[in-house]
From Swiss-Prot:
Coiled-coil spans in chain: none
Location in the cell: Cell membrane
Protein name per the record: Olfactory receptor 56B1
Domain of life: Eukaryota
Family: Belongs to the G-protein coupled receptor 1 family.
Length: 324
């Protein structure tokens, strides 16, 4: 009640105007949140450690400074940004009861989440293009996927997502929030926040849907097209061994794509079926922002021979240092 009274102001029109939101955490299991914070904290620390280690390994090994691993390094930075955008605040809610978040902070978090998720989708598309050129046009690969192209593609994704995401928090900030300010969530999601608005929130829902289709929808379509062309090229190879080797270079990337976009689709379905305030979609939303940053380095380390060898070398050096 203290949070509620402190975060509502009376305007000249005698309406209660919200000045801050209260994030209640996972719906229906508030008493378990201290226990849930432990795996979340471990996932966050493992995400930071694993992604940082990947970056160091790529930086220190000239043999790994190839387009595929450079894109992986960029993905690692995006993953750390995404995890850091949400997990520290969630842990503050669970450990210190820091449930209050100001409107500017909330809208900034909405922007950051959408930006990093869009960047992840964009980098996955860049990695799909890299695999397409490597398998379908191997002789032209060095002249096509150059350092200049990688830089331009990355800058394009930054600009694209920066522009695409801007309308989402801007429209959310223009809504009239009155009376209710408690959100059954661990983070500021656009649809969760705008569901508290007193005025028409359809522009926000339409905007998010359109931008999602223009951004991640187009990324996924191009990724699918890339893999159709890759599969067509592989099936034309005379050697089964060569075909298997070509497809093996895509296994890590395909694993990330399937996990990332499957959860995106499930979350979208839960929003369309009006399940926004129940435990499952809230939990999925949080996991979608923390599992990929933790999973991506592990997938590549286990499935990529060069990176696995570099990991083993680092672990051997660390073990030797500890024993000495």
């Amino acid at each position: 009640m203290n949070h509620m009274s402190a975060s509502l102001k009376i305007s000249n029109s005698s309406k209660f105007q919200v000045s801050e939101f209260i994030l209640l955490g996972f719906p229906g299991i508030h008493s378990w949140q201290h226990w849930l914070s432990l795996p979340l904290a471990l996932l966050y620390l493992s995400a930071l450690a694993a992604n940082t280690l990947i970056l160091i390994i790529i930086w220190q090994n000239p043999s790994l400074q190839q387009p595929m691993y450079i894109f992986l390094g960029i993905l690692c930075m995006v993953d750390m940004g995404l995890a850091t955008t949400i997990i520290p605040k969630i842990l503050a809610i669970f450990w210190f009861d820091a449930k209050v978040i100001s409107l500017p902070e909330c809208f900034a978090q909405i922007y950051a989440i959408h930006f990093f998720v869009g960047m992840e989708s964009g980098i996955l598309l860049c990695m799909a293009f890299d695999r397409y050129v490597a398998i379908c046009h191997p002789l032209r690969y060095p002249s096509i996927v150059t350092s200049s192209l990688i830089l331009k593609a990355t800058l394009f994704m930054v600009l694209r997502n920066g522009l695409f995401v801007t309308p989402v928090p801007v429209l959310a900030a223009q809504r009239d929030y009155c009376s209710k300010n408690e959100i059954e969530h661990c983070l500021c999601s656009n649809l969760g926040v705008t569901s508290l608005a007193c005025d028409d929130r359809r522009p926000n829902s339409i905007c998010q849907l359109v931008l999602a289709w223009l951004g991640m929808g187009s990324d996924l379509s191009l990724i699918i097209l890339s893999y159709i062309l890759i599969l067509y090229s592989v099936l034309r190879l005379n050697s089964a061994e060569a075909a298997a080797k070509a497809l093996s270079t895509c296994s890590s990337h395909l694993t990330l794509i399937l996990f990332f976009y499957t959860i995106v689709v499930v979350i979208s379905v839960t929003h369309l079926t009006e399940m926004k305030a129940t435990l499952i979609p809230v939990l999925l939303n949080v996991l979608h922002n923390i599992i990929p940053p933790s999973l991506n380095p592990t997938v590549y380390a286990l499935q990529t021979k060069e990176l696995r060898a570099a990991f083993q070398k680092v672990l051997f050096a660390l073990t030797k240092e500890i024993r000495s």
